[in-house]
UniProtKB/Swiss-Prot annotation:
Gene: pfkA
Amino-acid positions noted as binding substrate in the UniProt annotation, renumbered to this chain: T127, I128, D129, R164, M171, G172, R173, E224, R245, H251, T252, Q253, R254
HAMAP family assigned: Phosphofructokinase_I_B1
CDD domains in the cross-refs: Bacterial_PFK
The protein's assembly and partners: Homotetramer.
Protein name: ATP-dependent 6-phosphofructokinase
Keyword Signal appears in the UniProt entry: no
Positions with a binding annotation for ATP: G12, R73, F74, G103, D104, G105, S106
Length: 321
């Protein structure tokens, strides 16, 4: 029977993580459990950075961005000896189960603890990239979307005033969900995402066609890591003679107070994680599909499940632009 649980946040931070921690802590306490927080993710677990959490520990955090527990990337966790020491930390505090909030890398860590040591782990999807399998939305995605959209709206104002071409680089790594949604909502003229690839010459031809038809400005939304956006801006400007500038939104997309959607989603997922543990589940990851909370085998989610591409949204954007 579960008596003590711990929660950690791992990898890149995302708005709403604090709300998820709050959900885990208060749901756990309501079940009579002792709840611990692990500072700085798996790195903190390795270095015994464990603190006890009470109701007041999570007061006034639901509206705060980031994660008050801290987060860190810890590639050393791939080492079996490092994982074994992390398990020793859990045993030291007699912690029975662990809730891990993060992305694919965080899930992989939970998967290894489950497979190798039988630790009851529950994964919650916390990343602005929306690239975790088994869920329609991840914690932080909607807030990051609003941040990106605000930037696009501001760029449109100045691009229109100066007949400028603006390139906006949006986070997402190898997933184009954030770029696609922000571009559709922001009315961007061109969208470049990993799922559809990038043909520079085709982009330049499309821009040329648009200006030949009377366009006076353009906004290009592109997912990070696909190309050097500043070099692309220089090439476009040299080709057309139109002033072209690139804006990299970067880590501003991770910060800021979470929106209502993310606060609610994170709270629901945090409470649901505790419910699953009380029902005897372990080695699961939580998601939301068709507005309902679901859970999947965490190993299956990592190795077999794939996120479907939002083809309908992409096709809609093509018709509008």
């Amino acid at each position: 029977m579960v008596k003590k649980i711990a929660v950690l946040t791992s990898g890149g931070d995302a708005p709403g993580m604090n709300a998820a921690i709050r959900g885990v802590v208060r749901a756990g306490l309501s079940e009579g459990l002792e709840v611990y927080g692990i500072q700085d993710g798996y790195y903190g677990l390795y270095h015994d950075r464990v603190i006890k959490l009470e109701r007041r520990s999570v007061s006034e955090v639901i509206n705060r961005g980031g994660t008050f527990l801290g987060s860190a990337r810890f590639p050393e966790f791939k080492n079996p000896e490092v994982r074994a020491k992390c398990v020793e930390t859990l045993k030291k505090y007699e912690i029975d189960a662990l809730v891990v909030i993060g992305g694919d890398g965080s899930y992989m860590g939970a998967k290894l603890l489950t497979e190798e040591h039988g630790i009851a782990c529950i994964g919650l999807p916390g990343t602005i990239d929306n690239d975790v399998a088994g869920t329609d939305y991840t914690i932080g995605f909607q807030t990051a979307l609003e941040t990106a959209l605000e930037a696009i709206d501001r760029l449109r104002d100045t691009s229109t005033s100066h007949q400028r071409i603006s390139i906006v680089e949006i986070m997402g790594r190898h997933c184009g969900d954030l770029t696609l949604s922000a571009a559709l909502a922001g009315g961007c003229e061109y969208i470049i995402i990993p799922e559809k690839g990038f043909d520079k010459e085709s982009l330049i031809r499309n821009i040329e066609d648009g200006f030949n038809k009377g366009k006076r400005h353009a906004i290009i939304a592109i997912t990070e890591l696909m190309t050097d956006v500043h070099q692309l801006a220089r090439e476009i400007e040299e080709r057309f003679g139109h002033e072209t500038r690139a804006a990299v939104l970067g880590h501003t997309q991770r910060g800021g107070a979470p929106c209502a959607f993310d606060r609610i989603l994170a709270s629901r997922m945090g409470v649901y994680a505790v419910e699953l543990l009380m029902q005897g589940y372990g080695g699961r990851c939580v998601g939301i599909q068709n507005e309902k909370l679901v859970h999947h085998d965490i190993i299956d989610a990592i190795t077999n499940m794939r996120r479907p591409f939002k083809e309908e949204i992409f096709n809609t954007s093509r018709k509008l632009f």
